[in-house]
C-alpha cells in the first residue's frame, strides 16, 4: 500500500460529514468515468470502421480528452469512438452512466437535475442526445404474424416560444376538430410474436397507403401474415405487395382463430400514451420520435428482465 493511502486513511476520521461525502462522490465520478470510457472504447473496437468512409484500415493516433484517437489509412481522417454520433462534443462523461440510469427510471428533468447535479438546460439537451442513440436498438425486420395498428397524438407546441395555433390550457380543451384531422399525429406501431416492436411517426391525419409503403414496407418480411383492422389502406397495401392479410373487424374477436388479433399492439398503444401523459404531461410533437424510441428501450428492458 502506498504511503499516501495511509495518510488519507488517517485523515478521513478527522473530516466533517460534508468533506467525506465530497470525497465519496468524487470517487464515484472517477469510477463512472472509467466505466464509460471502457464502453466507448469497446464500441470502436467492435465496429472497427471509419465513420467517414467505412474503411477498416485504422491505426491508433494518440489520445484526446481521455479517448483514443484513430487515423483511417484510406481517407486519412482522424476520429474517436464518438465522432459522428449524437454524443460528439458532450462533456462530463463521468455523469453519463448516472444520467442513462435516470432515463431508465423515467425521471423528469427537474428530478434528474437534483439527482446528478447538472443544469436544467443540460438535462434537457442530454435527454435528446441520448434518445437519438436509441434508434439503433430497433429491429430491422418483423417476421411471422405481425400486428399493425395506428394511434394518434394531438399536435403539441410544448416549449415553443412562438405558437402557430391557439394554446391548449393545460390540456383542458378538446381538439379543435372531431375525429381524425390535421390536428392529430399518426403513429404507426407494429409488433410480431417475438415481442419485437417498431414505431413510426407517419404524418398528420389518418393513415394512408403511401405512408405504409414509405415507412413500413422495408421492415416486414414478404412471407409474414399482416393482422390489422379493416382500414382500406392496409387492404390496398397488402394487395399491392402480395402480403397475406388477416382483418380483425372487432378488436375483441379474432378473424379465424385466436392467433389473429391486434391485442398486443393495442396494449402497447395504451402503455405509450399512459407513460407520455402521466410522466411528462404530454411532449412536443417535434420530439415525439425521441420519446417513442426511449419507450421502446424501456419495453425491451422489461421483456429481457422477465
What do the predicted segments below correspond to?
Residues 1-306:
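Residue-level recognition of single "structural anchor" positions
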Amino acid at each position: 500500500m502506498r504511503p499516501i493511502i495511509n495518510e488519507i486513511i488517517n485523515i478521513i476520521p478527522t473530516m466533517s460529514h460534508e468533506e467525506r461525502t465530497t470525497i465519496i462522490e468524487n470517487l464515484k465520478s472517477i469510477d463512472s468515468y472509467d466505466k464509460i470510457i471502457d464502453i466507448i472504447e469497446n464500441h470502436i473496437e467492435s465496429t472497427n470502421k471509419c465513420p467517414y468512409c467505412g474503411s477498416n484500415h485504422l491505426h491508433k493516433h494518440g489520445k484526446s480528452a481521455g479517448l483514443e484517437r484513430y487515423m483511417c489509412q484510406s481517407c486519412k481522417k482522424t476520429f474517436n469512438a464518438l465522432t459522428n454520433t449524437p454524443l460528439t462534443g458532450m462533456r462530463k462523461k463521468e455523469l453519463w452512466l448516472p444520467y442513462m440510469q435516470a432515463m431508465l427510471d423515467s425521471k423528469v428533468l427537474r428530478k434528474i437535475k437534483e439527482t446528478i447535479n447538472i443544469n436544467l438546460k443540460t438535462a434537457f439537451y442530454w435527454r435528446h442526445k441520448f434518445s437519438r442513440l436509441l434508434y439503433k436498438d430497433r429491429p430491422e425486420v418483423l417476421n411471422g404474424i405481425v400486428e399493425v395498428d395506428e394511434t394518434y397524438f394531438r399536435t403539441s407546441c410544448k416549449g415553443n416560444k412562438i405558437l402557430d395555433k391557439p394554446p391548449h390550457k393545460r390540456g383542458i380543451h378538446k381538439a379543435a376538430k372531431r375525429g381524425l384531422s390535421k390536428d392529430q399525429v399518426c403513429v404507426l406501431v407494429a409488433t410480431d410474436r417475438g415481442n419485437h416492436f417498431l414505431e413510426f411517426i407517419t404524418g398528420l391525419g389518418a393513415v394512408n397507403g403511401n405512408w405504409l409503403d414509405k415507412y413500413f414496407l422495408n421492415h416486414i418480411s414478404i412471407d409474414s401474415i399482416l393482422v390489422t383492422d379493416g382500414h382500406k389502406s392496409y387492404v390496398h397495401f397488402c394487395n399491392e405487395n402480395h402480403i397475406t392479410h388477416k382483418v380483425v373487424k372487432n378488436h375483441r374477436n379474432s378473424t379465424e382463430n385466436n392467433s389473429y388479433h391486434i391485442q398486443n399492439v393495442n396494449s402497447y398503444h395504451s402503455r405509450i400514451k399512459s407513460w407520455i401523459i402521466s410522466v411528462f404531461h404530454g411532449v412536443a410533437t417535434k420530439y415525439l420520435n425521441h420519446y417513442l424510441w426511449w419507450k421502446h428501450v424501456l419495453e425491451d428492458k422489461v421483456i429481457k428482465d422477465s
